[in-house]
Structure formats: structure tokens, C-alpha cells
Amino acid sequence: MTESFAQLFEESLKEIETRPGSIVRGVVVAIDKDVVLVDAGLKSESAIPVEQFKNAQGEIEIQVGDEVDVALDAVEDGFGETLLSREKAKRHEAWLMLEKAYEESATVTGVINGKVKGGFTVELNGIRAFLPGSLVDVRPVRDTLHLEGKELEFKVIKLDQKRNNVVVSRRAVIESENSAERDQLLENLQEGMEVKGIVKNLTDYGAFVDLGGVDGLLHITDMAWKRVKHPSEIVNVGDEITVKVLKFDRERTRVSLGLKQLGEDPWVAIAKRYPEGTKLTGRVTNLTDYGCFVEIEEGVEGLVHVSEMDWTNKNIHPSKVVNVGDVVEVMVLDIDEERRRISLGLKQCKANPWQQFAETHNKGDRVEGKIKSITDFGIFIGLDGGIDGLVHLSDISWNVAGEEAVREYKKGDEIAAVVLQVDAERERISLGVKQLAEDPFNNYLSVNKKGAIVTGKVTAVDAKGATVELADGVEGYLRASEASRDRIEDATLVMSVGDEIEAKYTGVDRKNRVVSLSIRAKDEADEKDAIASVNNKQEEGNFSNAMAEAFKAAKGE
């Protein structure tokens, strides 16, 4: 009875061991090119694909005679052969290893081999695990290229074999490893000290540096004294660098680091090295809509404003003048050491066409050029050197109002003018067209003095008075009250357009270029002259009579 029970128990164990999915131990009996023969003590030897016995490097990891665990796929496949799987056995072993690591909070080794939504995939001895993006490191990591393909340690934080779900954390391993080192570092860390670290992550605003359990931020503005567009210009992930501790907040465990502070500040005493007016060469490092930046020495850049790029083109885009990388000659215009700003000039290193014009032209010189534009206030004429001169509306014609005179011109016309004034500093040249001829108004006044009797033709008349053309380009004005010795309320009653008149020149308005006229004053003057003439004749008659009487008396008559 006892033997029967023992026999039955042993047979039941064998049944369990030979069920599909069971893990059995076998011996490698042969290794062929494509298969490995394994004897697991079953009905027949099993041929297993050789690929299932290769490691990650593609090397066969067994020899003939080695014992290996394999999974039983089928006791008999219909051809009398037993089907075994080394791959499934490996997977079973991997799950056992993961369960043990999970229970004991131990680390496991794996390789990050892909990116998925929310994180990454990790290969753990044939088991695919999920690594959340937030658990890659103690700091957020955007780029994992430096980690992919490398064997790393992880902790299993979630395990469900039935659902084939494994979640791991690299952050937990780092925090655990860095705990002791971190405590020691925090205890010794002081502001001003120099420390070594490894760049572990880059952002648009800087780089995070692992100091050994503690991360410090190397801000982009503290990487170099020069302008830095992106941290990758200075450091790369994985670089080992020496930095200076600028600020350490022990309570919040925040460390600010500096790289440029390891060297001397190039801005110190820069005004002494480059006095205003100094000419030097530099390299164009950046272009903007408002100018370009030029590096004049390592870590020192100045701005050439767009207005200081060209003497004649004020609104030209910097890209039309220079390119990034160009070596250019510039002049120091201004230095603000406190604000760390240098104003540079590009055009100041070239000949100033305004100054050249001032040196080669005098007031009254005749110039010629094409009309470049016509505005509400005058005409711009293109001159040698790419500069413009302005003919103001008031300097177009002696006789015609500027608004009317300008209509006779159009863009592109060749035109002559006279230089009236040159202000090289303000970059202004005043020209005149009417000055090409003599001023008829001044000529008229030089010939006709105040008080003279002049003649003219009425060109316009209203109640208040009449406008009189005295000569070509010369006007006079006769007020109604000056039109007659009689009281006149309305000039139209005594004058009409076209009337020829004779009047006295009584005054001049040089600003408005008008001669004041008076018929009344002329008539009064004429009357006075007539009276004087009569009186003279009477006096002459009386004198003649007196002489005759005296002559008679002398004869004794």
C-alpha cells in the first residue's frame, strides 16, 4: 500500500513536470549551425534554434555538456518529437529575477531602447519595461541620446506578470546612490568655491550640472562674457567642467553656477583700452533688425546701430551691409561700462560724403542732379556721393508760390540749383532754384527809391484795395483808403482790373515782397508842387515890378 502511494505520488510529479509550459533542465548534447540539441530526459531530444542561445552581442553562450533550463512547449508534436524553448525559459528566469528584485527593492540592469508616449522602453533580459519620462533622472531630461544603448541600473516600482506590465525607475537608483555623496557635498559646499561636475541636461536657458548628488544650474548668461545664443555653443551633455559656485540656497538646495567667472572680466577698464574714436577690427556675431553685433575681443561685443552703418542709407537692413562672420573695421562711439554696452560705428571708418561736399562746395556754387523725390515741403536732388540736397518750396521761384511752382517738376528731371547752406554735422544741404536768376524784387527796389512815382497795371481788385503789377515779378498794393483824396469805402468803385495807374511808392514789405502804393499821396504831392510853382511865379512877378520902379527912380523920372 505504501509503495503504491509513493509510486502514484512520483508519477503525479512527473505529470506536472511534463505539462506544456513547465521548466525542465536539460543537457546540451550537440551544437549545429542552426540548432542546438538538448536532452531533457523526455521521449526524445529536442532541436532548439541556435538564436535562442545567443547573448546580446550575438555570441553563443553555451557549450556541449552544459546544463540549461528550457521550457516545455509540447511533449509530442505529432511527429514523435519533444518541443523545447530556451527563450521562454529565459523569460521565465527574467520574471523570477524581476519578482525578487521587486520584493527586495534591489536594482536590475537594463538598456533604454526606445521612446514611447510618456516615457521610454527598457529591455530587461528579454522583458520589455516602461520607464516614465519623469523617472529618467532627478531632473527633467528632454534628450536621452546619451543614455540610449548603455547598460543602466533601474529599480522595479511596479510588476504585473499576468498583464505583462513592468514599470522601472532610474531616478530611484540615482537618488539612492547619491544620498551619501549628496550629504557630504551639501555640508562642504560654499559660495565662491570651484567644483567639478558633469553636464547632464541642456535647456534654452542654461545647463544642469551634476556636482555629485546635487544638481546646479549654469545659466546661459553665466557661461561666457560674450553673447551666447544657446548653451550648446559652450557645453555638451556629458562634458566634465569646472565651475564656480555663485549662489547656494541651503534651505531650498539650489545651486547657481558660473563658468565665465573663472576668468577675468573683460569689461573692467574697457573704456581705457578703447577710448571714444578708436578704430579697430572685429567679427560680426549676430544680425538684428536694428543693427549688428561685433565682437571686438573675446567676451566683448558692441552694437552697430543701423543708423551708423551707412552714410546715405538710413533704413537699410543690416543683412544688406554685412554678414555673420565678416571681419569689419568699426569705430568706438560710446562706452557704458556700468550697463556693459558699447556703441560702434561702421560708416565712421569710411569717407563722409557730407563732409566731402562741404569741403568742395561753397555757398553760391551751382550744382546739378536728378530729382529723387518731391514732398510737401520741397524737392530732393541727388548729388555726388549718394547724398541729397533739398530745394524748399520757398526757393523754387521768385514770382510763383512754391505749391504752384513745384508742379512744373517731376521725379527723374535733371535740375540745376545753387548751394545755399551746408550743415555736414546734421547732414543737410539747402539748395535753391530761384537763386539761379537775380531777384526782380530787389532789382526793382534798387532802381526805385521810396517816395518815387511809379506806374503799374491793376491785376486784382476788391473792396479793400487793389493788387498792382509794377514789373515782371514785382507787385504793389494800393489800399482803398489810398486810392483817392476823397473818402473811398470800396476800391472797386474807382478801379478795375487792367487799369493803368500812377502812384507814389510809400513803403515796402520785404517779407511778403510787396510795395505799398498811394494815389492819394501822389495827388497830395502833385497839389503841393503846383502851389509851390504858383507862389514862385508870383514872387518872380513882384520882383520884376520892384526892379522897374527902382530903375525909374534912378533916372529921375
UniProtKB/Swiss-Prot annotation:
> In its keyword annotation, does this UniProt entry include DNA repair?
no
An MF annotation (GO) of this entry: structural constituent of ribosome
Q: What is this protein called?
A: Small ribosomal subunit protein bS1
Instruction: Give the GO cellular component terms, alphabetically.
Output: cytosolic small ribosomal subunit
| Membership in a protein family | Belongs to the bacterial ribosomal protein bS1 family.
Q: Which GO terms describe its biological process?
A: translation
Q: Which keywords has UniProt assigned to this entry? A: Repeat, Ribonucleoprotein, Ribosomal protein, RNA-binding
Keyword Manganese attributed: no
Membrane-spanning regions, if any? Answer: none
Role noted for this protein: Binds mRNA; thus facilitating recognition of the initiation point. It is needed to translate mRNA with a short Shine-Dalgarno (SD) purine-rich sequence.
| InterPro entries in the record | NA-bd_OB-fold, Ribos_protein_bS1-like, Ribosomal_bS1, Ribosomal_protein_S1-like, S1_domain
Q: Where is the S1 motif domain?
A: 21-87, 105-171, 192-260, 277-347, 364-434, 451-520
Q: Do you know which SUPFAM superfamilies this protein is assigned to?
A: Nucleic acid-binding proteins
**Organism per entry:** Dickeya dadantii (strain 3937) (Erwinia chrysanthemi (strain 3937))
Entry's Pfam families? S1
